[in-house]
UniProtKB/Swiss-Prot annotation:
Reported impact of residue 15 to A: 2.5-fold decrease in potency to inhibit human Nav1.8/SCN10A sodium channels
UniProt organism field: Conus magnificus
Name the record gives this protein: MuO-conotoxin MfVIA
Subcellular location: Secreted
Consequence the record notes for mutating residue 6 to A: 1.5-fold decrease in potency to inhibit human Nav1.8/SCN10A sodium channels
Length: 32
């Protein structure tokens, strides 16, 4: 899903956890 909070974690299996901003999708991975 899209990020809803300012610093919400996205899961990227290769890089581990990364931050993303509200309303953004982390590359091919979505926020959890």
């Amino acid at each position: 899903r899209d990020c809803q909070e300012k610093w919400e974690y996205c899961i990227v299996p290769i890089l581990g956890f990364v931050y993303c901003c509200p309303g953004l999708i982390c590359g091919p991975f979505v926020c959890v």
